[in-house]
Amino acid sequence: MPKCPKCNKEVYFAERVTSLGKDWHRPCLKCEKCGKTLTSGGHAEHEGKPYCNHPCYAAMFGPKGFGRGGAESHTFK
């Protein structure tokens, strides 16, 4: 029986979500930064951990520079 990488408990077929090559419990597959529940294949991965594509993964690991969340980024109101 496979174990969930988040909670390390057994994952039964009825509650299984497969993502990143592993079987997860549906509520355990969450973005590491914001905690949003993710869907299989609908997210990004960094060092084996799931992240929502936008805004978390893009802000943390995407291109940096003007207008991209880096040091030179500005928000106008």
Swiss-Prot record:
One of its GO terms (molecular function) is peptide binding. GO terms for cellular component: cytoplasm. Pfam families: LIM. Keywords: Acetylation, LIM domain, Metal-binding, Methylation, Zinc. Gene3D superfamilies: Cysteine Rich Protein (2.10.110.10). The keyword Metal-binding applies. The modification Omega-N-methylarginine is found at R68. The modification N6-acetyllysine is found at K9, K22. Transmembrane segments: none annotated. The keyword NAD does not apply. Residues 2-63 form the LIM zinc-binding domain. One of its GO terms (biological process) is regulation of gene expression. InterPro entries: Znf_LIM. Seems to have a role in zinc absorption and may function as an intracellular zinc transport protein. This is Cysteine-rich protein 1. It comes from Homo sapiens (Human).
